[in-house]
Amino acid sequence: MKKNRAFLKWAGGKYPLLDDIKRHLPKGECLVEPFVGAGSVFLNTDFSRYILADINSDLISLYNIVKLRTDEYVQASRELFMPETNQAEVYYQLREEFNTCQDPFRRAVLFLYLNRYGYNGLCRYNLRGEFNVPFGRYKRPYFPEAELYHFAEKAQNAFFYCESYADSMARADKSSVVYCDPPYAPLSATANFTAYHTNSFSLTQQAHLAEIAENLVSNRIPVLISNHDTALTREWYQLAKLHVVKVRPSISSNGGTRKKVDELLALYQPGVATPARK
């Protein structure tokens, strides 16, 4: 089956893991994603309804605009994908415009340009909330028109919310399945490449996410979580059934060092016996 790509480039995007995720994702009517990111899982599953959330307000605003003003958005965005916009001076001018822009539609148009022309598809903000990714110097950035239209069509059955993982998981009911793709736990003390947004994700929040998953499955709502395979994640997810998969990281400081690493898919499934928490 053909896989559908997201229209955004995204750190930690789940496109490479789709087959593994779909293999372990339980059936249900509604998929709840508290960390929707670029939406690869949403775009490649067939639930009747979707509740898609993220803490990044720019991302959720963009998705609602693509859903509701598709043709207008595609036309406006296409105008920025020109040879004359593929230069550092123009990129930094448009980045500055984005950081001062108050108009949601124009901001969404600029967001796609910055995503495709910026370095490595990163979405990163400084402590003042300003987008600060440098120019990417790509030969000819791709304009994802087909991907935008596919997203917009699929989004007619989705609701997008800018809110915390706890609030979006609270929306799940007995007809729901929850898939969580949190900013990954560090592999080591120096591996802290998880603060893609100004709200970085703490170890306390990682543990809290697992607690919410335990509460949901006790109410017969299944939860699947992806994360690095570490001693900490195995401790957090000790009540889940763990599946190990290998994946090559999509983003690294050095493209030549993107070696495959072990990741966990932690499945909290109603009715499946799990060991007691230690």
Swiss-Prot record:
UniProt catalytic activity: a 2'-deoxyadenosine in DNA + S-adenosyl-L-methionine = an N(6)-methyl-2'-deoxyadenosine in DNA + S-adenosyl-L-homocysteine + H(+)
EC number in record: 2.1.1.72
Alphabetical list of SUPFAM superfamilies matching this protein: S-adenosyl-L-methionine-dependent methyltransferases (SSF53335)
Entry binding sites for S-adenosyl-L-methionine: 10, 14, 54, 181
UniProt entry keywords in alphabetical sequence: DNA replication, DNA-binding, Methyltransferase, S-adenosyl-L-methionine, Transferase
Keyword Methyltransferase: yes
Gene Ontology molecular-function annotations: S-adenosyl-L-methionine binding; sequence-specific DNA binding; site-specific DNA-methyltransferase (adenine-specific) activity
UniProt cross-references to InterPro entries, sorted A to Z: Ade_MeTrfase_dom_2, DNA_methylase_N6_adenine_CS, M_m6A_EcoRV, MeTrfase_D12, SAM-dependent_MTases_sf
Secretion signal span: none
Effect of loss of the gene: Cells are more sensitive to mutagenic agents.
GO biological process per UniProt: DNA replication; DNA restriction-modification system; methylation; mismatch repair
Domain of life: Bacteria
Family in the record: Belongs to the N(4)/N(6)-methyltransferase family.
Function summary: May be involved in methyl-directed DNA mismatch repair, initiation of chromosome replication and gene expression.
Protein's recorded name: DNA adenine methylase
Species whose genome carries this gene: Salmonella typhimurium
Phylogenetic lineage: Bacteria, Pseudomonadati, Pseudomonadota, Gammaproteobacteria, Enterobacterales
